[in-house]
């Protein structure tokens, strides 16, 4: 894990015009990150990696409500306020081992947000790992229908067999 100051320094040294930070389930580093990036002349993109379940966030049942990762990044003030609302709701109403949101909350608070399918823990990837291509495509379509052009399929290459196996399918889904 990288420290905020080191991330901003790396961005400066590599002439990156913008960088994002997406803590898991929280936004603890958002203010420090914003201030350091702004001071360095870098566009700070504030986000969060959420834990999303498919059921009611008030139900405390992890066996029937698997958690998936989902990246949300604020693209404007409305998006930032919606990030805060989602994080607060996840902690105050949806907490069960982890702060959770669901698709119903996303429908209510999606404005001003950019959405990415996330890592191997994301719902699209989890279906692909189980060889459920059609379900993965359906999930991606549901998010694209909600976020429109602000929904992105995330490709990662950390030299992991799972990513090597699923990235070609992710590229097909992204088209």
At which residue positions do the language-model features occur?
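Phosphodiester-processing cores and adjacent nucleic acid-binding clamps
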Residues: 1-175
């Amino acid at each position: 894990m990288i420290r905020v100051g080191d991330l901003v320094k790396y961005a400066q040294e590599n002439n990156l015009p913008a960088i994002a930070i997406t803590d898991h389930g929280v936004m603890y580093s958002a203010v420090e990150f914003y201030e350091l990036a702004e001071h360095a002349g870098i566009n700070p993109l504030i986000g969060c990696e959420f834990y999303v379940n498919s059921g009611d966030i008030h139900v405390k049942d992890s066996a029937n409500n698997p958690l998936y990762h989902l990246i949300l990044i604020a693209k404007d003030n409305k998006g930032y306020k919606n990030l805060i609302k989602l994080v607060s709701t996840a902690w105050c109403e949806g907490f069960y081992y982890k702060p959770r949101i669901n698709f119903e909350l996303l429908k209510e608070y999606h404005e001003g947000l950019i959405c990415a399918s996330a890592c191997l823990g994301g719902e699209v990837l989890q279906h692909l790992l189980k060889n459920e291509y059609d379900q993965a495509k359906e999930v991606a379509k549901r998010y694209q229908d909600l976020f429109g052009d602000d929904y992105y399929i995330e490709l990662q290459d950390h030299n992991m067999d799972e990513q090597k196996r699923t990235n070609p399918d992710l590229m097909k889904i992204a088209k």
